[in-house]
Amino acid sequence: SFPTTVALTTPQLLLGGQAWHKLTLSAEKQLGATVVSAKSDEVDGSLRVADRGPWRADINYLYYNPQFAETKSAAGSPPPPPEKVSFRDWPSLMLRCKSCWVLGQNLGKVEADLSNRGDTLTLDHGLVDTGKGRMSATGLWKQNAQEERSSLKGKLLGGKIDETAAFFGITIPLKGAPYDVDFDLYWR
């Protein structure tokens, strides 16, 4: 019989373009799922990989700032065409992150429900709440042999637009103005 829990501890793991320091990974088989937990200087969270149904990621904090090496094409040659992405085998995922830092930017609370519907990936309950401003969104990304299209619809909301802009390192002339902006974007 195989063990129900497996744990790995390492001083550093290079994965996803980033070094994860003082990392402890564990996987535990539970009824109807496997729970993978990660704890390091850069992440503290768990992923519940359900046998059936959506996966669920509960993250207390994440600092993800990948450093990928740039690949240069030969002089005068065009860059290679982008690879097609297929959503068919992607799992549906519920993401809940209490404190997320991505590419050096503190995004704060991040939530998303991603669902796979064949050649379409949908976003419901998309949320980024920095504490200075809030974005909620729904979206759709469709890709198949006949078409490629994307849409994102949502709302930006905050009490003081200058504080929200300053949070992202931008200075604007408007001061102290509340904002409530709806957006509806489509592209192919």
Residue ranges and their predicted role:
Residues 3-14, 39-78, 85-101, 106, ...:
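Small-residue helix/turn framework positions
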Residues 32-33:
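A short glycine-rich beta-turn/N-cap micro-motif
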